[in-house]
From Swiss-Prot:
Component of the Mediator complex, a coactivator involved in the regulated transcription of nearly all RNA polymerase II-dependent genes. Mediator functions as a bridge to convey information from gene-specific regulatory proteins to the basal RNA polymerase II transcription machinery. Mediator is recruited to promoters by direct interactions with regulatory proteins and serves as a scaffold for the assembly of a functional preinitiation complex with RNA polymerase II and the general transcription factors. Keywords: Activator, Nucleus, Transcription, Transcription regulation. GO terms for biological process: regulation of transcription by RNA polymerase II. It comes from Debaryomyces hansenii (strain ATCC 36239 / CBS 767 / BCRC 21394 / JCM 1990 / NBRC 0083 / IGC 2968). The keyword Nucleus applies. This is Mediator of RNA polymerase II transcription subunit 5. The keyword GTP-binding does not apply. It is found in: Nucleus. The gene is NUT1. Component of the Mediator complex. GO terms for cellular component: mediator complex. One of its GO terms (molecular function) is transcription coregulator activity. Belongs to the Mediator complex subunit 5 family.
Amino acid sequence: MASSTATVSLHNLVKLCCKRNSTSKVFVSLYNQLEEKSPIQDNDYLSNLLQPDIKNKSKRESSLITEYILALAISSESQLEKFWKFLPEILLENQIHYMIELNSILLSKSNIERPSSDIFKEIVNNCFFKYTSSYISSLFPGISATQVSLLNHIIVVWCSVIRRSPFHLNTSSFKQLAVKIVSVLTECDLRNSLNYFISNTSSILNTDDLQVDSVQDSDDKKIAAIRSTTTIQLVNNISSINPKSRKATQLNVIKRYLWLNSIMKNWKFSNDVFLKQFEQNFLPNSSNNLKKPYVLAFELICAFFKGIVTSICSNESKYVLFNWKNFIITRLPTLLNDIKFTTSHVAPTSNDSSFKQETLDDAIINAFESFEDPVNKVLTQFSIDNLSICDLRQTFIKSCIYNKLIPVMSYHKIFTADNTVTDQFLNNGIEQVGQITSIRDEFETKLLNINTEFTTLEDSGLIEYINSLPGLLEFSATKQLELSETVDQVIEHLIDEKNIEKLYRLLLSVCNNLTTLNLICFNSNCGPFSILYKLINYIDNEDFNVDDDDNFQETYAFFGIIILAILLIIETFKIDYSQITVTNSYIVDYINEFYYRLCDSLTNISTSDTEEDNTIISNYNDLISDWINALFDDNNDGLSDDLIKSVNVKQIYKMIPIIYQQSIIATNSNKIDIKILNNGIDYLSQMFLIPCTLNIIKWLLRRIWADDPTLDCLPVQVLHELIKSNMGESDEPTSESKLFFQIVLKISGNSIISTLKKLNNWENSNLIKDIIEKVSNSVDPMYLENDLSIKLNERVNLYEQLKTNVINLVNNMNIYDYQFLNIFSSIDRDNELIRYIVEEITSYQKTNGGNEDTKLFINLSIFMILLDAIDNDDDKQYWIKRIKDTMVPVSSNSSGENRFDISMDYHYSSIFNNSDETSNNDYLFSGENNNSSVEIEGLKRKIGRHESLLNSFNKIKEFCDTEVQSTFVKSLRTFRDKLINELEVFTLNV
């Protein structure tokens, strides 16, 4: 081994370690062995380690080499000296790379461990200190972008040192260096960098320090620097809240809840750093706590159980409540399992008896005992659907036992008075959870491997199996994940195989059980969007032509179930596509024009007057007349196969709502009688036309208020007839067509019930009572929404109401109604919250920092803004850049600036002239598909950023750099600096 090592060069060592993906520890060890045999020359060190030729290296190799050299550098003082000696000799771009990795090491975000205390001190007080001093001495006004970038990264490293390890820093020496940095930043007019540096060094620098030689070249720049320091002091005052005060504790609880609720709303359950984020943001002092595992477990349990109670009291959407419940039952035990309770966390010499409370059982018991009466009342009688009731605490403990987190005997240790649950019952539960069969096998048996010609949907057992899943998988996180993965894979497989009949069976079964659908979405990495985008892309890329297919009505029905599945997901999970238009996307156009806007944007006026266009329009008018006669004329033979096949199914789904709207209007005008209208409505019970009833129902509900809203007005009569013709009598067996229409009612049911119950004395109408009964029986009780609206005081400023709400919550720990905070971003139509916060900062200045409530309101409001705006690290970096940018945004005079779309002419002929058909043919030849989901996701991101409250800051941030010295401008600068500070350290969701 020794002889072979002697022949190994540094070049080969680096190459071998990269190939094997060796850790930095392994590399350092091998490097030291190599250097013992033969000293490594400086040129070899430079060319193979410090600045290797990266042209022929992958990104992974380059990253590994960076780790290797830095790990080597901090392994000893001699290696450290060597690294910093040669670092200034390499390209600036490479130096930037090392600064980034060095900062990651300091923030413990690198694969390399933080250096020892002695090495760390040597870096910051000697090596990095000299490197910085030498570099800034070489700078002058007009420096290049690369030089600025390196300077900024050097500043970032220093700021990380100050925030994380100020006690290692020689403060007096650093002050001298900091003054030079401020001077260079001022001379080079790098205002954003200057503000950032001063704001992060305010604990070390003061106004007097800044006046020492730093800005002597310019009185204006000196004033600007001092003004910045004054602003920073105000930021610090606003941010400084006594962490031990009761109000600070309650503020932390509110922030914690808002974050957890956003997770439940936005499907962020698969966050691998959840525990780390929870601890860093809401338990800042736990790292030094001898009882850290106990404290973390206790706070987690309190946060989730009080959180779900708060969401119930805040009238959250039903899917959000389900997500809370399912997280508590399946994910919370997993999180608690990741908290290791060991004897190392006990202080045996302490006389404090509380140190004995270090087991998970103790954390659970003490958390439950800490709940206030209002919390216990909700938990012990827990129900989402107002029908099935359980004690959520007991359900959670059962899950912990079934998943072997705690032993069976813990149940009666926690619930000493409960004699209804025996040890045998709990052992049976453990056995049942462990014996759940393969989800994939069940789908193979009940769907994928059957012959649909010989096995009906009912005989396949698929519906019964889908309905059994919520109860079967209630306590098994792994099986729930398997379910989501299986359904996702099956849908993708069936779409690839174009097996639309089996896709129809799957969607019909799943969409008739919203709890199963919610369960699938909960355990998907992308929430509901994984399934949703697959269906959207399929609709947009498949033409669904039937040609001579004798079963064309089935094909049309299969198309309809996909449309309904998309709309069901959108409605159930509160997804808003009303501001999105995608080029050549049939489904997005359909959702917007025929579902949201109910054909309001359409007109029968042509935008062209050529003979050819007029002929086409005339032919289409004749075709529509044929459909009207077939649907509503008693003397006609009804809808013939030839007539149905004369129009593509995509066109039918746009045409039918218009025809029926006009027929209802004609009936209301006495142009046709109700009998003729009812004859036409009977056709809507045909499977392939059932999905069209959804648009008609939505239109009828709106029409109730457009007409005279009497109890038995025409829209109510039509709605009743429509439901009766599709549902039949309640004692009839459930057919596929009935299941089909039940999906329509699951989508529209909440709107139907809430609209009809707003009519005066609705209880006196037999028609309305019959409608509500049929709808209530079809909609899953768990997803029958309460009235989600909130009553606002029109006479009080919206932002004053928010402030009052926040102060009440901070001052009263027994208030659990957070609805106003939860929905504030959706009701703040004017996006004026930022202006109001600036006014509050002004008010705070006038009281000389004496108003604690104002300070708390400012902090919580900014937290709410960031939580709403930042969904990932890309968002965070985007907003940091935008807010630091002093460029005035270009304003738009377009009336459609709040909507990202492509203009098009809306007229009836557009129903037939679908632009997506031509594009789909192009894709057939090119072998590519129209990926609408990618475009939708991109537009969602743009719209989210455009509508973010942070975006409204762009309208006023230009005043930050004005020379006017007003209280408002000072407040605005303070807000900007506070915002930047909060953004820099914001780690939630990223």
